[in-house]
């Protein structure tokens, strides 16, 4: 960089190992290559410049020539065509030749000439009535090539002129033929004249228009026009633009039409049917499109594009009006007409279902007009799918889609699809049957995920043969051990998808919906809708399918909730279906188990999986495992005793986590025996949720105000829980009522007795939960419908017998009444009678003036049962549940059905198992299993009545009911200890005593069986608190 002082030039040494010659050769080659590329680029630029110059010169020459021709035209025919006569349209005239050559839509003068030309055309046709001779002269056949070229060019020029000036003519685009003075009306009527179906050139014009993307031009005109004030206040008259479409649409290439088939991207389906609510704008076009042959053509065209995975929808759609949703709504709007035709084929129904399925899969979930989601009811949380963020359909478009898939559409579609597999047919085509079943299932599955579910379910359950057809198909496949694979038109299903997957995922929710209205006589006696033998087979099929999905081939990451991301349906539809499948099959099996519990028609073990072992149970306790997922999703697959073990393990873990405080930190209650409910309420209500989970120690105070003897090691608390539950749930106190079979449920009129009745219900919920939390069984027989509320389940008509069998019989009488129900003079009101106070309550707004008729009797029945089962006790049940869930989470309770839940609360109704108690008894103080006193004791115990056995159990354990799983699980184990050293007179005069906290019986060595029985009976019947201890 800087001068070093040495002027000599030193030789540079290249250490790269290459000679200078080699380096120079490489450099030369690189320079040559660059020079060659430079010359090539220069050549391309010169060529491009020449083309641009040539194009420019051509356009300039064309413009000059066009201007010259325009000048000559105006000189000859006038600026406003004032020199034109009818012969100007003939082949020999230069009028059309010159005009079509120089016409430019953006030129205002040219546009005026075009309008005047079309006005003259209409005038000449009106006067002569023969448009063919107007264009061809005397002989059309000899001049048809020229004439055809001119008329198709003229027709397109009229449409193009309006399209190019659509923004300027925004308010004139949607005009009627009667508005003859408006330029757009004149142009469109000229096109209509040229498209008369009787004319010989009509197919050539339509083919030319379609090649020039006429439907795209019309779409853009309509889109512009709809923004104008006129577009928002349309009359019912036919529009000129609509008339043109009506004349073009029937040209679908079938005889006698000879039009070429248009590219689907620019077809009527892609360009016009994707216009939002097009039938409101063009109602007459709807009538034309509803023609079976036209609809079949366009719907088949859409179905073919879907199967080829070809995107033909326009891109310039708004989020509120996506093209696929508009196409779906407009297509389904006319599908009823097609499906109602006697000649409607299976292929046509399949195409309609395929198109509807594809676009329904893409839609975000649609809400019903009442604002409810697809589910229809709060409990029916089948198929919840999260809304797609930022994608909200326009309300009118939503309404169009939901109104289109109505009862008539569903009925007609299923009838056509199942026509070949009707229940009465002896022979059937297996391939057609699989095709029909697969198509119907895929469409309905997509509809369930998108549309308001309650309305669809009601239609399918009560107005179609869907359940019977699907069941016969599944039954036959199961018996033959051959499931047909779903047809190839269901592109999102992999080839190895089980054939039962889609039919079952549709069958289950529909059949479950049917069971909500079926009464006991229909189900058990009439065996409708399925026979009991079929139901037994159905249970086997459902159980096998569910076990296959949840255990054998489970999802990688099962969704434990019932909400499934809509992204999943796009990324992995098969996973979404499998997840959905697990939910609906579980729900149906659970409902069938409820029916079996009401009146057994199959063994309870039929609902249980065969592969549940101790390893499975150990896995089920751990969160995140497959076994734990099965426990939450389908607990009935696991035997009851295994679930009880899991439940008791969960309780023990929870107690251990809250029982680590020292003895001085425990909650202590001082309870007066004659004020047990009042004291328990005041002291227990003051505890926090955490304190409730901790140990509670009780000291009883007798009637004299003296504390009873005994230190509470758990036994006194058990006694307290048994006595407080007996007092609190006593119907005499007024918080609960009894059904006819002495089952308890909240008193609807509790507020008339206790001002703080809701707080008491919260307390009672906590009290019951505390008993279950501590593993104490209490004798409280709840009505089945009320136990459902602990599981947060909604009660339906079939739950009514557990509350009011008499009312249930009356409602079923109404349901089956053959005469005119209005003659019974019933109204939508219900009579409440609480403590002699009679009040009327409307079941619907204005119900006192709404008579019950044959049309609305089912609604009346459901409203009455809902009022009695849910509405009347909703506040009491809600507060009870809040208190209950302070200690017992919902997921623990969901493992059990209502009948099992009653066993969890109260234990088995069977008598005490003395042999089980004997096999799990320890001995101390000199006693052993073969001691003569012990032998006498067990003989006495077996001779006791069930009531005395319960008294004994309460005497030694503090609770009159044994452990759920038997005395093996009694902690600590029951023990009999010798109470005195010898059989002296003093010792045998003593009474047996107990230590309930240790489950210990102190038994003196009585000499005779009679004496032992007398002393033991006295001790267990004294009810002397803990003073005997």
Curated annotation (Swiss-Prot):
Family from the record: Belongs to the UPL family.
One of the Pfam families matching this protein, by short name: HECT
Substrates-to-products reaction catalysed: S-ubiquitinyl-[E2 ubiquitin-conjugating enzyme]-L-cysteine + [acceptor protein]-L-lysine = [E2 ubiquitin-conjugating enzyme]-L-cysteine + N(6)-ubiquitinyl-[acceptor protein]-L-lysine
GO MF term (any one): ubiquitin protein ligase activity
Region annotation (Disordered) ranges: 1-20
Species of the source: Arabidopsis thaliana (Mouse-ear cress)
Alphabetical list of PANTHER family matching this protein: E3 UBIQUITIN-PROTEIN LIGASE UPL6, UBIQUITIN-PROTEIN LIGASE E3C
Top-level division of the source organism's lineage: Eukaryota
Annotated pathway: Protein modification; protein ubiquitination
Protein name: E3 ubiquitin-protein ligase UPL6
Domain HECT: start-end pairs: 688-1029
IQ domain mapped to chain residues: 45-74
Gene label: UPL6
């Amino acid at each position: 960089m800087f001068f070093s002082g040495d002027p000599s030039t030193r030789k540079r040494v290249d250490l790269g190992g290459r000679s200078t010659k080699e380096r120079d050769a490489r450099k030369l080659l690189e320079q040559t290559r660059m020079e060659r590329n430079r010359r090539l680029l220069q050549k391309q630029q010169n060529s491009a410049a020449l083309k641009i110059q040539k194009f420019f010169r051509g356009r300039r020459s064309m413009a000059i020539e066009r201007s010259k021709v325009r000048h000559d035209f105006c000189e000859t025919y006038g600026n406003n065509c004032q020199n034109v006569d009818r012969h100007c349209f003939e082949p020999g005239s230069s009028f059309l030749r010159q005009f079509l050559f120089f016409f430019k839509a953006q030129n205002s003068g040219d546009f005026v000439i075009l309008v005047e030309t079309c006005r003259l055309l209409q005038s000449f046709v009106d006067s002569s009535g023969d448009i063919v001779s107007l264009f061809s002269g005397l002989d059309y056949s000899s001049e048809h090539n020229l004439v055809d070229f001119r008329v198709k060019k003229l027709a397109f020029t009229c449409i193009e002129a309006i399209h190019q000036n659509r923004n300027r003519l925004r308010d004139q685009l949607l005009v009627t033929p009667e508005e003859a003075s408006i330029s757009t009306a004149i142009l469109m009527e000229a096109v209509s004249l040229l498209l008369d179906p009787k004319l010989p050139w009509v197919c050539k014009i339509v083919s030319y228009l379609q090649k020039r993307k006429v439907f795209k031009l019309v779409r853009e005109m309509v889109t512009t026009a709809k923004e104008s004030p006129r577009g928002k206040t349309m009359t019912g008259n036919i529009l000129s633009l609509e008339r043109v479409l009506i004349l073009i649409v029937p040209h679908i290439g079938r005889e006698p039409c000879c039009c070429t088939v248009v590219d689907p991207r620019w077809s009527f389906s892609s360009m016009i049917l994707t216009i939002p609510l097009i039938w409101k704008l063009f109602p007459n076009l709807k009538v034309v499109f509803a023609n079976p042959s036209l609809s079949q053509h366009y719907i088949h065209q859409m179905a073919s594009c879907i199967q080829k995975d070809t995107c033909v929808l326009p891109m310039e759609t708004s989020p509120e009006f996506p093209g696929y949703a508009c196409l779906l709504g407009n297509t389904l709007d006319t599908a009823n007409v097609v499906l109602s035709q006697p000649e409607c084929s299976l292929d046509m129904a399949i195409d309609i279902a395929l198109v509807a399925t594809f676009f329904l899969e893409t839609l975000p979930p649609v809400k019903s007009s009442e604002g409810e989601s697809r589910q229809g009811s709060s409990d029916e949380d089948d198929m919840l799918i999260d809304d797609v963020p930022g994608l909200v359909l326009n309300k009118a478009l939503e309404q169009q889609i939901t109104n289109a898939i109505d009862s008539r559409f569903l009925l007609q579609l299923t009838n056509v699809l199942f026509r070949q597999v009707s229940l009465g047919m002896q022979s059937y085509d297996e391939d057609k049957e699989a095709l029909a079943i697969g198509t119907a299932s895929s469409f309905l599955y997509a509809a369930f995920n998108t549309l308001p579910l309650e309305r669809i379910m009601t239609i399918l359950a009560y107005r179609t043969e869907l359940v019977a057809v699907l069941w016969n198909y599944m039954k036959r496949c199961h018996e033959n051990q051959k499931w047909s694979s779903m047809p190839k038109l269901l592109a999102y299903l992999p080839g190895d998808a089980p054939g039962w997957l889609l039919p079952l995922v549709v069958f289950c929710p529909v059949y479950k919906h049917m069971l909500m209205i079926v009464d006991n006589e229909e189900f058990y006696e009439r065996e409708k809708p399925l026979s009991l033998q079929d139901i037994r087979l159905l249970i086997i099929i459902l159980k096998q399918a569910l076990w296959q999905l949840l255990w054998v081939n489970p999802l990688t990451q099962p969704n434990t909730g019932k909400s499934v991301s809509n992204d999943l349906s796009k990324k992995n539809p098969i996973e979404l279906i499998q997840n959905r499948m697990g939910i609906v099959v579980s729900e149906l099996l659970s409902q069938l188990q409820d029916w079996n519990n009401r009146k057994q028609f199959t063994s309870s073990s039929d609902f249980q999986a065969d592969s549940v072992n101790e390893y499975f149970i150990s896995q089920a306790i751990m969160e995140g495992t497959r076994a734990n997922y099965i426990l939450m999703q389908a607990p009935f697959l696991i035997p009851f005793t295994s679930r009880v073990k899991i439940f008791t393990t969960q309780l023990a873990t929870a107690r251990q986590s809250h029982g680590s405080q020292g003895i001085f930190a425990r909650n202590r209650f001082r309870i007066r025996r004659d004020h047990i409910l009042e004291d328990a309420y005041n002291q227990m209500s003051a505890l926090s949720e955490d304190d409730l989970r901790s140990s509670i120690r009780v000291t009883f105070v007798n009637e004299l105000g003296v504390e009873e003897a005994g230190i509470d090691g758990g036994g006194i608390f058990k006694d307290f829980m048994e006595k407080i539950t007996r007092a609190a749930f006593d119907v005499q106190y007024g918080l609960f009522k009894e059904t006819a079979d002495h089952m308890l449920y909240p008193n609807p009129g509790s507020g008339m007795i206790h001002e703080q009745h809701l707080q008491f219900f919260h307390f009672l919920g906590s009290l019951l939960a505390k008993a279950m939390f501590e593993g104490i069984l209490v004798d409280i027989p709840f009505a089945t419908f009320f136990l459902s509320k602990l599981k947060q389940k909604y009660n339906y008509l079939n739950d009514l017998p557990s509350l009011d069998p008499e009312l249930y019989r009356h409602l079923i009488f109404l349901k089956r009444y053959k005469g005119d129900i209005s003659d019974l003079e019933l109204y939508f009101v219900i009579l409440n009678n609480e403590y002699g106070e009679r009040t009327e309550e409307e079941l619907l707004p204005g119900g006192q003036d709404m008579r019950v008729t044959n049309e609305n009797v089912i609604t009346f029945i459901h409203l009455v049962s809902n009022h009695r089962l849910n509405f009347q006790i909703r506040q009491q049940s809600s507060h009870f549940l809040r208190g209950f869930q302070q200690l017992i989470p919902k997921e623990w309770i969901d493992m059990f059905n209502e009948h099992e839940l009653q066993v969890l609360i109260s234990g088995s109704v069977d008598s005490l198992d003395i042999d089980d108690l004997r096999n799990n008894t320890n001995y101390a103080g000199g006693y052993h299993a073969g001691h003569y006193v012990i032998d006498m004791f067990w003989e006495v115990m077996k001779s006791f009545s069930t009531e005395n056995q319960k008294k004994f159990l309460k005497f030694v354990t503090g609770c009159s009911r044994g452990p759920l799983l038997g005395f093996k699980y009694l902690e600590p184990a029951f023990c009999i200890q010798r109470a005195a050293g010898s059989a002296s007179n003093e010792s045998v005069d003593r009474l047996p005593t107990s230590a309930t906290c240790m489950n210990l019986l102190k038994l003196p060595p009585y000499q005779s069986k009679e004496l032992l029985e007398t002393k033991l009976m006295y001790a267990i019947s004294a009810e002397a608190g803990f003073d005997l201890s």
